[in-house]
Amino acid sequence: MSNTETFKFEAEISQLMSLIINTVYSNKEIFLRELISNASDALDKIRYQSLSDPHALDAEKDLFIRITPDKENKILSIRDTGIGMTKNDLINNLGVIAKSGTKQFMEAAASGADISMIGQFGVGFYSAYLVADKVQVVSKHNDDEQYIWESSAGGSFTVTLDTDGPRLLRGTEIRLFMKEDQLQYLEEKTIKDTVKKHSEFISYPIQLVVTREVEKEVPEEEETEEVKNEEDDKAPKIEEVDDESEKKEKKTKKVKETTTETEELNKTKPIWTRNPSEVTKEEYASFYKSLTNDWEDHLAVKHFSVEGQLEFRAILFVPRRAPMDLFEAKRKKNNIKLYVRRVFITDDCEELIPEWLGFIKGVVDSEDLPLNLSREMLQQNKIMKVIRKNLVRRCLDMFNEIAEDKENFKTFYDAFSKNLKLGIHEDAANRPALAKLLRYNSLNSPDDLISLEDYITKMPEHQKNIYFITGESKQAVENSPFLEIFRAKKFDVLFMVDPIDEYAVTQLKEFEGKKLVNITKDGLELEETDEEKAAREKLEKEYEEFAKQLKTILGDKVEKVVVSNKIVGSPCLLTTGQYGWSANMERIMKAQALRDTSMSAYMSSRKTFEINPKSPIIAELKKKVEENGAEDRSVKDLATILYETALLSSGFTLDDPSAYAQRINRLISLGLSIDEEEEAPIEEISTESVAAENNAESKMEEVD
């Protein structure tokens, strides 16, 4: 065929097809769901195009999906009257250009994900090879001729100008040449069951071409005539009777005839137009799966209508788990399908729902929006803003309903707590409502998640604030020296160990009148009695000179050295400034590949070195300073090691780990009575080098 061109599959698509062909996955019926879903998308596109171009439907006015099983030739055909594909579309979409989801799906499959997830990655077409050895795609676009794409998945495909086949007028027909062990999908019952299970709520008619054998009564005229002719010569002449008796004697017989007809499989009207009380759990589950291509049931559903000045209906679903690409920049910002008076408009409308609710899936059908909506109109439309506000409120209602069931809420929180915290960071209007949904482990509840409301209820009467600590992990914060005083006072402290917590608490300043206080920052004022205050002031005076000496040794590494009332057992710790980054935030920002380094210089807080006067180590070091002075080499080494150890225990990282290791090695040598001269000389840390090393940090002082 001179009009045939051969192309090679892009490497990733070849690998994907090989994975599908060789899979031992038993639930192969999902191929039909994927192909029907693609057909529905193609119909959505032509219907949307027809809103601005009335002639788009001229070639074929009816919009439908038709399934035709051909048992004789072992071919299953799925046809739609959608937008169709041009020659270039067939080449690019079905073989040459790999979609971003191709690689993601293969990675997910390699790590044990269910193959029925294929539709979520935009590569559902290739599921056809679960049941077919060869696939043909015949397509006719309004702007091009009719072409046939064909491949047996051997690494290449052909595209041919179709001059001989039946005319499609417009749309696409996929012909699956079925594998010998998959012929059950040519059976009427199997097709009906599969469509009901996966695609019952598709918005377009799904027709099944069925063959029926019907019995028909026909007169035995022909047979009688033949017998008559044969015996005409032999038989004697019989006297003719009148017409009436002749009619009585005429006989009929029953013959079987094969007829072909189309049967509509999805007559159920759109589920969102029905009264919520009439819809069963099974129907919601079926609709959710057909809408999202998920193989699991949803976690929660909210089905409602809004009437009055503005009218719309909606169904919103919370999935059981977060998609793998939930926070990827290129991902669609939401999963809500927007309809206007049952006409599909778009499923990529960023204005419909905020980004932090990007995991919500569902349908919104408005009575008031114009049908010919452009992206610009969507952005500026006041109705959209009202719909958005309503959707957010209903989502919050749904989350509160989930929270009533502890087990369900744990599933929800494990999957979507980051979204709630992103909402707290971005959505000022709903911040108080979102804060009620937050859950944390804490000092007094290390194994249970508690809410902020729970925390306040259990607060002692004299406690004024909500205390929290941020860190890399629960284990890291549980052993933090910052908690020592809180254990002693029996105050609870929330453990915030998700990196996004740092961003959320910068916006969530208080909850129900109680201020949220980070215990790793300076300026922490703990409630104390007059006696405790007098004892603290006495110790501050006693250690004032020692604190000055330590500041001299550490130089610009710290802003100040103070006597602490926060430490019970540890010798010292480091706190950060009120308005700069915490140790945990500093760690997070250092891990950002595209961070603004100039910002780091200002936001990396000046550190306060807090010493515990009741610690034997601090008391002994104070004596050593008084005896030998601040210039003594061992005093400098000990002070620096204390500082670096405090850095680590307070959640910071060391700028020069090798120098720290050398100092520790020197201490080990002393402990083992190894002669110092046997050791390689260790360069002393001068206050000048410390100043140079921390020049960037000093900028913070200028800003303050």
UniProtKB/Swiss-Prot annotation:
Basic and acidic residues composition-biased segments? 234-262
Location relative to the cell: Cytoplasm
CDD domains from the UniProt entry: HATPase_Hsp90-like
> Which positions does UniProt annotate for ATP binding?
N38, D80, K99, F125, R375
In the record, which positions carry Phosphoserine? S245, S277, S286
Q: Which UniProt keywords apply?
A: ATP-binding, Chaperone, Cytoplasm, Nucleotide-binding, Phosphoprotein
Highest taxon of the source?
A: Eukaryota
Per UniProt, the ranges with Acidic residues bias are 218-233
Question: One biological-process term from Gene Ontology?
Answer: chaperone-mediated protein folding
PROSITE patterns, sorted: HSP90
- Disordered, as annotated region: 213-262, 678-704
One of the record's GO molecular function terms = ATP-dependent protein folding chaperone
Q: A single GO CC term, please? A: cytosol
Motif mapping: TPR repeat-binding: 700-704
Of which family is this protein a member? Belongs to the heat shock protein 90 family.
NCBIfam families for the chain: PRK05218.1
Domain note: The TPR repeat-binding motif mediates interaction with TPR repeat-containing proteins.
Assembly and interaction partners: Homodimer.
Q: What does this protein do?
A: Molecular chaperone that promotes the maturation, structural maintenance and proper regulation of specific target proteins involved for instance in cell cycle control and signal transduction. Undergoes a functional cycle that is linked to its ATPase activity. This cycle probably induces conformational changes in the client proteins, thereby causing their activation. Interacts dynamically with various co-chaperones that modulate its substrate recognition, ATPase cycle and chaperone function. Interacts with the wee1 protein kinase; which requires swo1 for its activation.
Protein's name in the database? Heat shock protein 90 homolog
Native organism is: Schizosaccharomyces pombe (strain 972 / ATCC 24843) (Fission yeast)
Lineage, opening ranks? Eukaryota, Fungi, Dikarya, Ascomycota, Taphrinomycotina
